[in-house]
């Protein structure tokens, strides 16, 4: 009776897909270009794509006129194509690939949920993924990771489809199995062209460890590793070999070692402790992390072995990626995005059964605790947000009130609905709160803080003063990408040492330089420091930047 009654609140499968698509379009695409590209990644990636288009070199990428070997080209090709279709390198055009592949990733999650459990589980899981904090944010930002997550998820979907087709089905399914297993390798190849070796390491590790745990040796033999990896290499090397031939040994060393092996083993950027993700991931997967422990416990407790295999696949998927990046020296929260579909599916299955079956033990022992925790967090956050804003940014207090009302009101509404045991309404209330909060933040708050985050404003100061033939330099670790993009100046001279800066400012002609205010302040006390003119001072991201000139 419970399942029959609750099934009426869910639409048909094709309607579920359309609802997910429409939901993501509103959440990710509407007013996507309302704020500028923000440091450090967005304007740099946009500049790489623009130099590809302007230089008509789609093989060897450049930024600031120099060879760029940090990332493979696929994401930059997509930005270039998007900018061509949108009529220029606007914020919307540059972010469009991330929004597109974020949306497609939500739809892939729906299909995996449908494959493993039911279309209803897939529908709920898609909503969970779309409204998780980090996934939603990266789907509206010109970062590579939403695109990478799509291709790794597509690869694993093909693997799962191939594996399930191979269980107890006749030879009539062989062509479909072949198509699925080769789709697995094609997905890995495209993921590799998006972000390097991690694109094939993650799906391959997940699939092999899953088969190893199941002791399915025949499955490993049927994976067509030789022909599949040959197809993978053909796709990847069709770009990489010409790029190495053009870039030479230096490009080979940079792409093969510095940004892969060295970055993983030595962590020359973003070095963090091994336990970093244990406290970072829960924040990134809010609000759904509250229900993840219950989802894992519920998955272990299920009695049907075939259903356990589905849960095991999701557990291996998420666990392997979590462990892989935890062992890396360099860590960022965005690196874990490829595991978000897996944990969303776990939580989606929990919620599907929670609202449709009698899970008395889990309702009271696990989910009740998670719900009260979420209610408490929402209530505290709703009270704290306006208080913090009033203390530090008093003029912005009115803009914090809608978020405060949303959090406090949502918390109280959850409590009332929980009292009446309307669990489906609680789920959709959480979805609505997250969607409303994210939409308000990205469409109201982001444009509001844009003048303090964007490099465009100080770049306008440069463009209004610099004349043809005059040079622009940048001192210390500030990257050139944002200023290349917003000034259109290529190249910008990179000054790493004080001696370089001093020599630059002593040029006979007029020159301009960007540097941090703290560096400018300390350099003024140096003996022999030339007289310079302070032209502008602005906040760019978290940096206090000044523009100076020697004339």
Where are these regions (language model features)?
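Membrane-embedded architecture of ER/inner-membrane glycosylation machinery
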Residues: 2-3, 14, 182, 186, ...
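Membrane-integral, polyisoprenol-dependent glycosyltransferases
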Residues: 1-364, 484, 537-538, 543-544
């Amino acid at each position: 009776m419970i399942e029959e009654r609750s099934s009426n609140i869910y639409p048909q499968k094709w309607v579920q897909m359309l609802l997910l698509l429409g939901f993501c379009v509103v959440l990710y695409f509407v007013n996507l270009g309302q704020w500028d590209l923000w440091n450090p990644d967005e304007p740099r990636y946009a500049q790489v794509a623009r130099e590809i288009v302007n230089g008509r070199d789609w093989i060897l990428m450049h930024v600031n006129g120099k060879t760029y070997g940090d990332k493979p080209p696929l994401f930059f090709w997509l930005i270039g194509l998007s900018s061509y279709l949108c009529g220029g390198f606007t914020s919307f055009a540059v972010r469009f690939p991330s929004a597109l592949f974020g949306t497609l990733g939500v739809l892939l999650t729906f299909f995996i949920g449908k494959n493993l459990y039911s279309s209803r589980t897939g529908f709920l899981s898609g909503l969970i993924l779309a409204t998780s904090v980090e996934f939603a944010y990266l789907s509206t930002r010109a970062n590579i990771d939403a695109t990478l997550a799509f291709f790794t998820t597509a690869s694993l979907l093909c693997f799962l489809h191939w594996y399930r087709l191979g269980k107890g089905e006749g030879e009539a399914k062989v062509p479909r199995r072949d198509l699925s297993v080769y789709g697995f390798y094609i997905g890995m190849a495209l993921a590799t062209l998006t972000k390097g070796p991690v694109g094939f390491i993650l799906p391959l590790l997940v699939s092999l460890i899953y088969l190893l745990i199941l002791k399915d040796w025949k499955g490993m033999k049927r994976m067509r590793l030789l022909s599949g990896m040959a197809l993978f290499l053909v796709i990847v090397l069709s770009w990489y070999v010409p790029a190495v031939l053009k870039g030479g040994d230096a490009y080979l060393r940079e792409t093969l070692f510095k940004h892969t092996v060295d970055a993983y083993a030595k962590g020359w950027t973003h070095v963090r402790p091994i336990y970093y993700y244990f406290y970072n991931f829960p924040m990134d997967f809010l609000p759904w992390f509250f229900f993840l422990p219950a989802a894992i416990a519920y998955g272990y407790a299920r009695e049907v072995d075939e259903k356990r295999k589905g849960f095991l696949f999701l557990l291996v998927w998420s666990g392997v990626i979590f462990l892989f990046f935890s062992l890396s020296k360099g860590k960022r929260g965005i690196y874990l995005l490829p595991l978000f579909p897996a944990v969303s599916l776990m939580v989606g299955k929990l919620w599907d059964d929670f609202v449709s079956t009698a899970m008395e033990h889990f309702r009271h022992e696990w989910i009740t605790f998670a719900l009260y925790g979420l209610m408490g967090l929402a209530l505290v956050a709703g009270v704290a947000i306006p208080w913090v804003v009033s203390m530090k940014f008093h003029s912005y207090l009115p803009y914090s009130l809608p978020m405060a009302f949303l959090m406090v009101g949502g918390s109280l509404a959850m409590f009332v609905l929980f009292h009446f045991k309307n669990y489906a309404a609680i789920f959709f209330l959480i979805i609505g709160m997250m969607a409303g909060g994210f939409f308000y933040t990205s469409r109201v708050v982001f444009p509001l803080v844009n003048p303090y985050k964007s490099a465009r404003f100080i770049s306008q100061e440069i463009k209004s003063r610099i004349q043809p033939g005059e040079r622009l330099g940048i001192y210390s670790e500030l990257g050139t990408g944002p200023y290349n993009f917003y000034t259109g100046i290529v190249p910008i001279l990179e000054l790493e040492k004080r001696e370089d800066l001093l020599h630059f400012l002593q040029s006979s002609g007029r020159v301009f330089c960007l540097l941090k205010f703290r560096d400018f302040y300390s350099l003024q006390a140096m003996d022999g420091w030339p007289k310079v003119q302070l032209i502008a001072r602005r906040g760019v991201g978290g940096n206090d930047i000044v523009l100076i000139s020697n004339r």
